[in-house]
Amino acid sequence: MAVCPARFLTLNKRGFPEEVADGNCILCGHCVAVCPHDALAHSGLPQEPFLPAARKLPGPAVIDSFLIGRRSVREFTDQPIARRTLEALLEVARRAPTASNSQKLHWIVVGDRVKVHALSLKAMNWLQTAGISPALLAQWEKGYDFILRDAPAVIMACTPADYAWGKQDSAIALTFLELAAEARGLGVCWAGYLTRVAGVYASIRQALSVPEGYVVHGGLMLGERKYSYRLVPPRNPLSVQWV
């Protein structure tokens, strides 16, 4: 009962857990997941089996090396990403934590290179109207897609516009997806230009089929990486304040 974030459970007179009458369960599943005897079930959760939690993880050195070795990849091969691979990545991302377990994320997947390039064209139309640096314009005119980098797939994260934690939940879930893609050897880069334009340009929203009342908070370009990196570049010194 101590793991229930909403304090929704209490012990009855017989010593068994029961629901608090005026409680507010957030459907996190902690109560079922923590029970060592599989004695609990939860009627409010989706009817799918609980997955076994990892019993043994790689050591901190392995995980730290994986995390700091992650790179933004902007050069992709022509190889498409299989639908089953994209679905596997989304399965990981949908289990990312959300505020109060709200799970309000909606995903948009563009898994066709031709459609991805069409999004770049539409975004470029807006960028030229809004003003773009001569250097970027010159790159575009030479055939270099600096917007979506000729990626074979793009995944965008949305939430309802009136949901206060949409940006945070999207960033966390996209990071889960990015690291899951890295673990599968894929290259990933955040789709900043497309995210920016999707927030202000109706044509992009229509092309993405963003549901009415939803906002795009972020996205990723994905593909088979053309190059691999041998080294991890240095970063600025840590800026920290201990209080």
Question: What kind of region is each of these model predictions?
Answer:
Residues M1-V243:
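Acidic, surface-exposed loops and disordered segments
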